[in-house]
């Protein structure tokens, strides 16, 4: 039950992992969004997060017109949902109590996209 085995599992799925204090941050290669995995003893919280650079990143994609940004965001969220299923199994198998909080992050990201689309289309 080493955290290194968890990191190895995440990396094997194509993600980059950063460790800071009691937290692992799983980065996505397409968008500046990430999963934060926060440890507190035998409890762990997994949440979908992003930083301020996401707004500018989405604005640039929308203005370039080169991608369907909504589809891209949904794909990234879907990939993180799949990874979270693997994380859930790993944590349960290793005796952790897990609290998954992806929905809040999903809603925040989709609201950000809607705001940007309203501004750029209006």
Task: Map each language-model feature to its residues.
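Intrinsically disordered, low-complexity regulatory regions enriched in serine/threonine/proline
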Residues: 53-122
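Short, solvent-exposed secondary-structure boundary motifs
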Residues: 3-10, 22-30, 79-80
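Amphipathic, interaction-prone secondary-structure segments
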Residues: 13, 17-43
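Amphipathic alpha-helical segments
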Residues: 1-18, 109-121
């Amino acid at each position: 039950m080493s955290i290194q085995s968890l990191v190895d599992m995440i990396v094997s799925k194509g993600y980059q992992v950063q460790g800071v204090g009691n937290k692992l941050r799983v980065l996505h290669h397409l968008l500046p969004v990430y999963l934060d995995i926060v440890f507190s003893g035998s409890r762990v919280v997994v949440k979908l997060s992003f930083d301020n650079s996401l707004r500018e990143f989405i604005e640039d994609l929308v203005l370039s017109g080169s991608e369907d940004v909504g589809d891209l965001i949904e794909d990234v969220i879907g990939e993180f949902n799949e990874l979270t299923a693997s994380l859930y199994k790993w944590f349960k198998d290793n005796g952790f109590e897990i609290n998954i909080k992806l929905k809040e992050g999903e809603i925040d990201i989709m609201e950000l996209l809607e705001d940007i689309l309203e501004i750029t289309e209006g």
